[in-house]
């Protein structure tokens, strides 16, 4: 019998490119190793916590991935899993193309900023952030990519099918070559947009934090250029 809750911690490795000790391949490596671990592969950087190695849970079909500032509202996990399990959304992986060609291995819900109120909010958040909170009259949003091409853009916070996601991304990316992995993963694993399910996240508290985040995103997008033009 496995535990209901697991604490997984990865050991740090020295990265010559970054000149620092860090988790292998950051968040992309974390998900890659998690998928391998869930399928029984022992060769990962996950460490024993408290002297006991975590027991691998059996039969895990989906993984919901969130950032530290992301909030999962009540019943959202049930809605995400139910939508993934719908027969029309089930992913079909093509071994020849090495990607998902039908259905979706990833579903991206709508990301809504927290309401910038309370003692922790700032004037910058109230001025710059978009409309926050729950819209009681809102319905599913329209999205150009989803409406025209039946695919959405993965933003790194959502649910994915472990088997299809791992098969589509296996051996695709060399080390130290990709910072913004979300869009890349959404292309090969085929992401769908689920706009009638909300996740909430905190907007940057000041301009400096927001600028650093935007700079990181732009750097990551430029690193996708070799795959766009066919160099990779």
Residue positions per predicted region:
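Internal catalytic domains of large membrane-associated glycosyltransferases
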Residues: 1-232
């Amino acid at each position: 019998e496995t535990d209901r809750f697991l604490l997984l911690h990865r050991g740090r490795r020295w990265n010559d490119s970054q000149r620092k000790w860090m988790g292998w391949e950051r968040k992309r490596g974390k998900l890659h190793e998690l998928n391998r671990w869930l399928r029984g592969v022992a060769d990962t950087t996950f460490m024993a916590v408290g002297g006991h190695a975590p027991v691998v849970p059996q039969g895990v079909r989906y993984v919901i991935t969130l950032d530290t500032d992301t909030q999962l509202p009540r019943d959202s996990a049930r809605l995400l899993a139910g939508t993934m399990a719908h027969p029309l959304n089930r992913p079909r992986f093509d071994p020849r193309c090495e990607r998902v060609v039908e259905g979706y291995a990833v579903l991206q819900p709508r990301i809504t900023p927290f309401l910038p109120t309370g003692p922790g909010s700032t004037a910058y958040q109230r001025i710059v952030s978009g409309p926050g909170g729950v819209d009681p009259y809102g319905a599913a949003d329209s999205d150009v990519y989803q409406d025209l091409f039946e695919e959405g853009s993965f933003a790194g916070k959502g649910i994915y099918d472990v088997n299809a996601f791992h098969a589509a991304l296996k051996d695709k990316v060399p080390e130290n070559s990709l910072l913004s992995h979300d869009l890349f993963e959404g292309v090969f694993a085929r992401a769908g947009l689920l706009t009638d399910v909300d996740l909430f996240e905190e907007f940057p508290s000041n301009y400096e934090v927001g600028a650093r985040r935007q700079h990181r995103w732009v750097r990551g997008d430029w690193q996708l250029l070799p795959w766009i033009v066919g160099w990779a």
